[in-house]
A protein has these predicted regions:
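Short, surface-exposed polybasic-aromatic patches that bind anionic ligands, especially phosphate groups
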Residues: 169-170
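C-terminal domain-tail junction helix/linker
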Residues: 144-163
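C-terminal structured subdomain/cap of oxidoreductase catalytic cores
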Residues: 83-132, 138, 143, 164, ...
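Substrate-gating cap/lid region and adjacent catalytic-acid/histidine neighborhood
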Residues: 1-105
Length: 184
């Protein structure tokens, strides 16, 4: 965590650094488990969620850009149980461990998600274009099946974090990530 706090303080002014670090609960005083969770959220928001939204919004023809959000948490016991991350969506998407999902709700949302992606890949537009309204299809949390939402409805449950990144500037925050990843 010291690396992230040091890089953040080098890239941003004091006030912005304090807000960013507190929003993501990043502190040198974190326990190892807290540090991993805070870093995971920071990198998930900035490495996956924010770029996906920005790329979809920047697409030259918004009727040809589609965005989905898989926000179902990890169903398996352990440190990351309940957390929705990029690897969890792949776990549900590919269905290779579906027989190990602990509940029928997990199995059902996995099938719904996987079939929607397969259909979409075969030209069935069951995931609407993002358009000017920021429309996307969302699965989860808590077993909620795929449904249509807009970005204004906070489908990722990360509005505070995403708004802050937008305010500070995506490239500055990516600079913090890059500084962390290249630190010794």
């Amino acid at each position: 965590m010291k690396i992230i706090t040091d890089v953040t303080n080098n890239v941003l002014d004091d006030e912005a650094a304090t807000v960013l670090l507190s929003t993501f609960q990043i502190s040198p005083q974190n326990t190892q488990e807290q540090a991993v969770r805070s870093a995971m959220k920071f990198f998930t928001v900035n490495g996956f969620v924010r770029p996906a939204i920005d790329y979809a919004k920047a697409w030259p023809n918004p009727s040809k850009a589609h965005l989905f959000a898989f926000n179902q948490g990890n169903p398996f016991p352990g440190q990351f149980q309940g957390d929705a991350t990029h690897t969890v969506d792949a776990l549900y998407q590919f269905q290779t461990m579906a027989h190990l999902f602990p509940t029928q709700v997990d199995k059902d949302i996995g099938v719904d998600f996987a079939l929607a992606l397969i259909d979409f890949a075969h030209g069935i537009e069951n995931i609407p274009p993002i358009g000017k309204d920021g429309t996307l299809k969302v699965w989860g949390p808590n077993g909620k099946p795929g449904r249509i939402m807009t970005l204004d409805q906070d489908p990722y449950q990360l509005k505070k974090e995403l708004d802050l990144i937008k305010e500070l500037g995506v490239l500055k925050v990516w600079g913090i990530m890059g500084g962390y990843l290249t630190a010794p």
